Amino acid sequence: MGRKVTVATCALNQWALDFEGNLQRILKSIEIAKHRGARYRLGPELEICGYGCWDHYYESDTLLHSLQVLAALLESPVTQDIICDVGMPVMHRNVRYNCRVIFLNRKILLIRPKMALANEGNYRELRWFTPWSRSRQTEEYFLPRMLQDLTKQETVPFGDAVLSTWDTCIGSEVCEELWTPHSPHVDMGLDGVEIFTNASGSHHVLRKAHARVDLVTMATTKNGGIYLLANQKGCDGDRLYYDGCALIAMNGSIFAQGSQFSLDDVEVLTATLDLEDIRSYRAEISSRNLAASRVSPYPRVKVDFALSCHEDLLEPVSEPIEWKYHSPAEEISLGPACWLWDFLRRSRQAGFFLPLSGGVDSAATACLVYSMCHQVCEAVKRGNLEVLADVRTIVNQLSYTPQDPRELCGRVLTTCYMASENSSQETCDRARELAQQIGSHHIGLHIDPVVKALVGLFSLVTGASPRFAVHGGSDRENLALQNVQARVRMVIAYLFAQLSLWSRGAPGGLLVLGSANVDESLLGYLTKYDCSSADINPIGGISKTDLRAFVQLCVERFQLPALQSILAAPATAELEPLAHGRVSQTDEEDMGMTYAELSVYGRLRKVAKTGPYSMFCKLLDMWRDTCSPRQVADKVKCFFSKYSMNRHKMTTLTPAYHAESYSPDDNRFDLRPFLYNTRWPWQFRCIENQVLQLEGRQRQELDGVD
């Protein structure tokens, strides 16, 4: 009797609107799955067009080209004798749906629309799609003529149904549906579905993998069954990095784990599992069986096909494994580095240009490029021909093979220390030493002539000469003189990014990298249109605390001792005059708060969704052992005053890798006004009234003691 099934899931590095490339990656994944004996192949959400099409979903071209790719898949001999489950947008009765299209041997078995759409954080699915709200119901979908000619079908089932093969029952849920309070797999499992599939478009956030794995294992622990999860991987066109983690689970255990970060465009997981293990597991869960007797049945699409074969007694089954998680520092070293690689190769540029200041943030960005070079070299050594072809295109040398990460880094990364009269020798030395250790092409230059020319122009026109505060100038003069240095550096960065390879006789341009962290962006502790303005920023969604942990990891993993002195030095912008040759300005003094405090404010503001008064109330409890109510009030007022004053800077912020749940990214993750009443009169008055009450109560208690 046939009872062992081999199933496949995958993680694909799809690219929004790259229909040709997406088709080839889908076909390759199906080919690998068949070669490994799989009879069912699951792919990521919206894999045909790529998940991140955004407003291109409105365009009829996106629907048309998706249908054309589906036709090519139906027609390909690669897709024969295996059930293929692919994702694409489908219009049904003039309504757009996010769908799974499941087919076998040129016949479409079912079009299953997504029932719960992701619409929080970075997700905006309700903007483009409508959820299918008719649970356990199907309609006829009239196929376009291009598909009718191929399938010889006029209509196919469209809606919430399951597949019934000769040997088992298969049900689909799509990404967000796994995260809902009452996921479809619950009732499907009670109705006898044994194999659950989940096609995801789930992006990376630090520390998120645990939640994803826990949801899958818990689903199969409570109800039994096989669970396949597919996901997109890589950068498909914007700030998000989809982090793979395809998996196969059964009865609460993991049987196959895909990589979370990888340069492989196609990764296929297969597992051979025994259906009888599901049936025996479910048999002794009496609560599940009682609930199953009352569940409403799903429409079943009968499939003349089996996932198992008759002679499978000698077929070895897969063994359970322990899921291996990355630490947050490891996630940072891998995720943004893979994102940089995708951005570099797909933008068809020749490398990166990074202003290297000698501080932690720009050092972390340099280390991410170095980590990228490590991953490229490892992929080439493993025989990844796609990565080798891409790196040869980037360096413009068809016979090139990278020898080691340092040698490759010298070809793709140009670093530049832009000194001013306010720069210290220590930061200059630290930047140079790090550049030597990672192998980047390093440039040192002085910006003073340009700064003096600009300030001189202002003085010539106005007759006024601004001075730094230490020389008797006002706060306005002091800030303006700092900002002109920062903005000059941005202009110089773009000039050198465009022409530095030209000056060396090499073709191509460089992508300018920014290095402002998420905490500084939240507070607005950066100059608008300075070195925070770049083409992309790989650390813009990462906290200072996590960045320091990542840099410490690089000291050990990549043997970069220069990072030790960078970690030990106080963070400074070096925009004000030195005191006796030493740094007189530190970031935390300028901000009026520590980076640790900023992370707390950020999480409370975005994740806990607190305004000034609610944040004050929460911090009263959190900081009761270290701060008085008056101190807490002053800190909260300081944060919200500076945050609202600088909120306008977020509207022009460089696109940054999304990694943190409290990111202030203005693109679509954190939508706020950028013109505030920065005095917050009503909110601050509520805080002040509460402080006065608490102080009065404390005085009464002290008087009572006396």
UniProtKB/Swiss-Prot annotation:
ATP binds at P355, L356, S357, G358, G359, V360, D361, S362. Its EC number is 6.3.5.1. The keyword Cell wall biogenesis/degradation does not apply. Residues 325-706 are annotated as: Ligase. Residues 5-275 form the CN hydrolase domain. Keywords: ATP-binding, Ligase, NAD, Nucleotide-binding. It catalyses: deamido-NAD(+) + L-glutamine + ATP + H2O = L-glutamate + AMP + diphosphate + NAD(+) + H(+). GO terms for biological process: NAD biosynthetic process. One of its GO terms (molecular function) is ATP binding. The active site is at E45 (proton acceptor), K114 (for glutaminase activity), C175 (nucleophile), S357. GO terms for cellular component: cytoplasm. Pathway: Cofactor biosynthesis; NAD(+) biosynthesis; NAD(+) from deamido-NAD(+) (L-Gln route): step 1/1. It comes from the Eukaryota. Catalyzes the ATP-dependent amidation of deamido-NAD to form NAD. Uses L-glutamine as a nitrogen source. NCBIfam families: nadE. In the C-terminal section; belongs to the NAD synthetase family. Homohexamer. This is Glutamine-dependent NAD(+) synthetase. It comes from Bos taurus (Bovine).
